[in-house]
Amino acid sequence: MDSLATDPAFIDSDVYLRLGLIIEGKRLKKPPTVLSRLSSSLERSLLLNHDDKILLGSPDSVTVFDGRSPPEISIAHYLDRIFKYSCCSPSCFVIAHIYIDHFLHKTRALLKPLNVHRLIITTVMLAAKVFDDRYFNNAYYARVGGVTTRELNRLEMELLFTLDFKLQVDPQTFHTHCCQLEKQNRDGFQIEWPIKEACRANKETWQKRTPDSLCSQTTAR
């Protein structure tokens, strides 16, 4: 993944360093900043979509990524878990953000508590497969993400066909999304999203629940 984060035509070392995309040494001692920035971006989208749907009656599409109920784990904890156990490069989370944007644009679906977790695990997995030198099989990612292998296989195929198998990301697009993520929370914006009360998760929760039960079954078939 170094090719995108270090492209000489678009490199902004300050932005990449602040996001934790340029790694000094073999292993990060703590989660990169890009995780918190991505979490803030997704949470903000959830809040804005929620307000638009109530005030404007914005239309929404149901996809196979929609579950019956929101998972109990927060987006921030979910991203940390995926990073910890998937061992993917930090840049994969920027790529995942790009894939999510493209998917929502093509399907005209809204990002919401019912689909955000499945979109995250599926897009991060695909990003690792495309851009990382090493990655795990679908069964492993399914266990990390709290879904069944069968469901993750189905989500992967849905995402691939929706994106027309166009998974390559040019350096300019990558750089633009990095800048967008880096600006998150600069204005002191604080997420006040009610789902957080139901989505708080800690280590004890993960230990007590089986991974396949962390995400509820999907609604769309």
Curated annotation (Swiss-Prot):
Annotated InterPro entries: Cyclin-like_sf (IPR036915), Cyclin_P/U (IPR012389), Cyclin_PHO80-like (IPR013922)
Database matches in Pfam families: Cyclin
Keywords carried by this UniProt record: Cell cycle, Cell division, Cyclin
Tissue: Expressed in roots, stems and flowers. Expressed in the shoot apex, leaf primordia and young leaves.
GO molecular function terms listed in the Swiss-Prot or TrEMBL record: protein kinase binding
Annotated GO biological process: cell division
Top-level taxon in the UniProt lineage: Eukaryota
Family membership noted in the UniProt record: Belongs to the cyclin family. Cyclin U/P subfamily.
Quaternary structure note: Interacts with CDKA-1 and CDKB1-1.
Name of the molecule in the record: Cyclin-U3-1
Organism: Arabidopsis thaliana
